[in-house]
Design a protein with these regions (language model features):
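Internal helix-loop-helix
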Residues: 5-79, 120-127, 251
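Glycine-rich phosphate/pyrophosphate-binding beta-alpha loops
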Residues: 93, 117-122, 164-165
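Active-site-adjacent elements of ketosynthase-type condensing enzymes
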Residues: 91-99
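Short Ser/Thr-interspersed hydrophobic loop/turn segments at strand-loop and sheet-helix junctions
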Residues: 12, 35-40, 131-132, 148-153, ...
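Buried hydrophobic positions in well-ordered alpha/beta secondary-structure cores of metabolic enzymes
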Residues: 12, 19, 35, 65, ...
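Glycine-rich beta->alpha junctions and the first turn(s) of the following alpha-helix
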Residues: 155-255
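A short, Trp-centered hydrophobic/proline-enriched beta-strand micro-motif
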Residues: 79-87, 131
Length: 264
């Protein structure tokens, strides 16, 4: 597995469609689709499945400054930095826009205070991208900004949340006067809600690909359906036969849609 990762990294395929100047492979959408098809055909896993590559990186390419791109993107493409997401809070429930973690401007820094919860991998992450409130007087969707926070900063406390299984995939993170450079603001001040929505679009896109790329059994349903139908020819199996054919047709239509998206 290590050799596989190293070879994919050396080919710049950790982020195959990112610009070459930021460590990516420079592939256009059509060539990216070909690469994904070949990985699937060879039953190879995606080289990198993480928040940096699939979610934050595309947002930095769209909203980040040139300095931010140069600082944060190349380490992602080399697999050197781990990221976590600081969105959910203890008192907000599903109303994310009511978040209360504050970021007060002070000189060349923001001073961050508050807490995040259900943060996957925070105990191992190097950095967090966090939604914070930079204008408490503004309407709740308009006073939010997105900051990149170094998890080694003084004032950060990470507490793993032990699940009933004994695992601790999630954490609670506390910020006590954490100083974050102004240069780590992504997008405009108080414009973080729009940036976050864009980031979550990339999350949905990434999740939709995970099963398609990582489950070899789903490489091609058509031959499997044909074998199934050959062995289930009894009239009583008609409903099952129709369902199996519908699944194969849906998968084929999905791949045609991806091909069209690549061409566009």
């Amino acid at each position: 597995q290590r050799v596989w990762f190293e070879r994919m990294r050396d080919r710049k395929w950790f982020a195959p469609d990112w610009p070459a100047e930021y460590g990516g492979g420079g592939l256009d959408a059509a060539r990216l689709r070909i690469l994904e098809d070949e990985l699937r055909r060879l039953r190879c896993r995606v080289p990198q499945v993480n928040l940096g590559i699939w979610m934050l990186g595309p947002v930095l390419l769209e909203f980040g400054t040139e300095a931010q791109k140069q600082q944060f993107l190349p380490p992602m493409t080399r697999g050197e930095v781990g990221w976590c997401q600081g969105f959910s809070e203890p008192n907000t429930g599903s109303d994310l826009a009511s978040l209360g973690t504050s970021a007060r401007a002070e000189g060349e820094h923001y001073v961050v205070s508050g807490a995040k919860i259900w943060t996957s991998g925070a105990d191992k992450a190097d950095w967090m991208y966090a939604l914070v409130r930079t204008d408490p007087a503004a309407p709740k969707h308009e006073g939010i900004s997105l900051l990149l926070v170094d998890m080694r900063s003084p004032g950060i406390t990470v507490r793993p949340i032990e699940l009933i299984s004994g695992a601790s995939r999630f954490c609670q993170v506390f910020f006590d006067g954490v100083r974050v450079p102004r240069g780590n603001l992504i997008g405009p001040v108080n414009g973080g809600w729009a940036v976050a929505k864009r980031l979550l679009q990339h999350e949905r896109s990434a999740m939709s690909k995970m099963g398609d790329l990582n489950l070899p059994a789903q490489v091609d349903l058509v031959p499997a359906v044909k074998r199934f139908l050959a062995g289930a020819a009894a009239p009583g199996d008609a409903a099952i036969r129709q369902r199996a054919v519908a699944c194969a047709m849906d998968q084929h239509a999905f791949h045609l849609t991806l091909d069209r998206m690549g061409q566009e």
